[in-house]
Amino acid sequence: MDVGSKEVLIENPPDYSAAPQGRFGLPCFPSSLKRLLIIVVVIVLVVVVIVGALLMGLHMSQKHTEMVLEMSLGGPEAQQRLALQERAGTTATFSIGSTGIVVYDYQRLLIAYKPAPGTCCYIMKMAPENIPSLEALTRKFQNFQVKPAVSTSKLGQEEGHNAGSASPGDLDFLGTTVSTLCGEVPLYYI
């Protein structure tokens, strides 16, 4: 190298600092590609925020629905608890506050109602295409209790048996759940 060029370099050393790269400092990308990348990142962030808001709204709606269902099933005027039988899921038992217990037996198409004092048990057949609601059944059974003049027959007498001599084996046609509910009290078929 020439001595003169060394002096020039010593007096004015070359600038080894990095070239200005803009605001975000994305190296090795042309400016059009940088803009496109920024736009894509912004769009992805907006989509993530929108999806998050929708999922949060769905979660809140589900919690609200569960809370309304829980409040309607556990209300103070008619406390209703549903317990499905584990085996085949063929019976549903409802405790209606302090008024009594209703059992739907879907396999045998029977509905049993035992009032709270537990003095008797009412049994009726149900049609599979027209299953009465719990509210309609409660009204029907309560109206039935108010009117003692309605002629009813004991289940054993209607079947041609003597009701007083009915053994526990004679109640097998009612099923386990209904037999457990109504086994110790007189049965009336409606």
UniProtKB/Swiss-Prot annotation:
Subcellular location as annotated: Secreted, Extracellular space, Surface film
Keywords: Disulfide bond, Gaseous exchange, Lipoprotein, Palmitate, Secreted, Surface film
Propeptide cleavage-removed residue intervals: 1-23, 59-190
One GO biological process term: respiratory gaseous exchange by respiratory system
UniProt domain BRICHOS: residue ranges: 94-190
One term under GO cellular component: extracellular space
Disulfide bonds: C121-C182
The UniProt record lists the keyword Lipoprotein: yes
S-palmitoyl cysteine-type lipidated residues: C28
Top-level lineage group: Eukaryota
KW Secreted (keyword) present: yes
InterPro entries the UniProt entry points to: BRICHOS_dom, SP-C, Surfactant_protein_propep
Gene3D superfamilies from the UniProt entry: 3.30.390.150
GO molecular function: identical protein binding
Cited function: Pulmonary surfactant associated proteins promote alveolar stability by lowering the surface tension at the air-liquid interface in the peripheral air spaces.
Miscellaneous comment in the UniProt entry for this protein: Pulmonary surfactant consists of 90% lipid and 10% protein. There are 4 surfactant-associated proteins: 2 collagenous, carbohydrate-binding glycoproteins (SP-A and SP-D) and 2 small hydrophobic proteins (SP-B and SP-C).
Entry protein name: Surfactant protein C
Organism: Neovison vison (American mink)
Gene designation per UniProt: SFTPC
